[in-house]
């Protein structure tokens, strides 16, 4: 059995860092060591930022984005097109589309995609709240900006079916988004072109 060579506080820091996507145990140890070496310049400000995030960050009750206000700054931005909602799987997809800066629309974060094998059905996603927005607000277009995976396309078809009784235009991102690709990994130019060339769904 491996012997602990650090105190429990450091072990806990390493353990928690290792739970961050993309960081394994070895990377977490390196990150923890770097943070501790830069205690005043990095560790203490990071601790403060994390405490602030715990205290102040909340999920927007309208679109599902995260912000320090509810509704979020996107939902309250008067420059946005109130008639257009871009539907995304995750907040990281919203951020990617915002970086592209092509379309000032509203968003709706599903919180995932349909995946029966993983136990994720319509009730686990923010689909009902999307339908309620369409009922309540004067929406003219829904842009399905879901990932070009099998699960993403299944989700898009399900949403299209649920909205079939409404007189709204439903489009999806153009096929410039590679099949099997994740929005968060695409460059800004590709995302901008995909938004401009969206097609009926």
UniProtKB/Swiss-Prot annotation:
Signal peptide (residue range): none
InterPro entries tied to this protein: DNA_Rcmb_RecR, Rcmb_RecR, Rcmb_RecR_Znf, TOPRIM_dom, TOPRIM_RecR
SUPFAM superfamilies (alphabetical): Recombination protein RecR (SSF111304)
Zinc finger region(s), C4-type: 60-75
GO BP, one annotated term: DNA repair
Domain Toprim: 83-178
A GO term, aspect molecular function: DNA binding
PROSITE patterns: RECR, TOPRIM
Cross-referenced CDD domains: TOPRIM_recR
Alphabetically ordered keywords of this record: DNA damage, DNA recombination, DNA repair, Metal-binding, Zinc, Zinc-finger
Protein family membership: Belongs to the RecR family.
Role according to the record: May play a role in DNA repair. It seems to be involved in an RecBC-independent recombinational process of DNA repair. It may act with RecF and RecO.
Identification of the protein by name: Recombination protein RecR
């Amino acid at each position: 059995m491996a012997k602990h060579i650090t105190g429990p506080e450091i072990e806990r820091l390493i353990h928690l860092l290792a739970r961050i996507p993309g960081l394994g145990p070895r990377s977490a140890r390196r990150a923890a060591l770097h943070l501790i070496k830069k205690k005043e310049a990095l560790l203490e400000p990071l601790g403060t930022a994390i405490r602030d995030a715990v205290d102040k960050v909340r999920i927007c009750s309208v679109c599902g984005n995260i912000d320090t206000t509810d509704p979020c700054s996107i939902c309250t931005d008067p420059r946005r097109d109130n008639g257009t909602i871009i539907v995304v799987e995750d907040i990281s997809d919203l951020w990617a589309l915002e970086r592209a800066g092509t379309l000032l629309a509203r968003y709706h974060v599903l919180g995932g995609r349909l995946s029966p094998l993983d136990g994720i059905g319509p009730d686990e996603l923010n689909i009902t709240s999307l339908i309620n927005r369409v009922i309540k607000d004067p929406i003219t277009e829904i842009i399905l900006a879901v990932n070009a995976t099998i699960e993403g396309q299944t989700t898009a078809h399900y949403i299209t079916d649920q909205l079939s009784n409404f007189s709204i235009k439903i489009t999806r991102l153009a096929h410039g988004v590679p099949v099997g690709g994740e929005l968060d990994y695409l460059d800004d130019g590709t995302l901008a072109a995909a938004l401009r060339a969206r097609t009926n769904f």
